[in-house]
């Protein structure tokens, strides 16, 4: 049961884990649902717990009474992943139910190019925040499960180029029932492919036949370290307590 207080998780939770990795001091898991195990205390914990509510793909995190801090939290996205180590990599929030809560990222490169990695659910507030950063020039889709609202984002940013592997491109009559046939750059073969200097797409089949990871070298991330965006097939296992691979199906 949810801890007594203003914040709670309702029965619409789909157990995607978003809130639990974002704010583990507030959210936990019971059976196949998340719940509030401890009400947040202090402005820092409250902001993180509310950010998880914004990111929740099903809007399952609610409040008993209006939360004064919520407006500022909504306006805080995109959130830095690690301002010291990866100052140009951000968490977009606004996870989509159609991608089962997959995490979307933003890479803001030194030349002014902004790349989304996997699509969040569409939000006009997030779109305005992205416009203030110069818009979005690339949408890098790791695989077919995580395309979410890519069509609506393309409508908002018409010059944006979407990228995914041709083996994962589907029409609206196939899982996940989202039309991908209009994706501008459909990668063929085994790669790797250069998106931009310092940004490569690497074919990593397994989770799906067309799964692709995107490697951004250190200069693009603004630090001494690069970033590898892997989609769903590489994850942290809470059960095992370590990094692990999702089940291989089409290696």
Predicted regions and their residues:
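Active-site HxH/HxHxD metal-binding segment of metal-dependent hydrolases
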Residues: 122-197
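Short cysteine/histidine-rich zinc-coordinating motifs and their immediately flanking basic loops
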Residues: 24-35, 66-71
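Conserved small-residue-rich
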Residues: 12-13, 82-130, 134-143, 153
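Cysteine-centered iron-sulfur cluster-binding motifs in ferredoxin-type domains/subunits
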Residues: 7-23, 41-59
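Residues that act as N-cap/strand-start positions at coil-to-secondary-structure junctions
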Residues: 99-101, 181, 187, 208
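Zn-dependent metallo-beta-lactamase
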Residues: 45-111, 157
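Metallo-beta-lactamase
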Residues: 112-116, 121-124, 137-138, 160, ...
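A detector for short, charged/polar N-terminal pre-domain segments
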Residues: 1-2
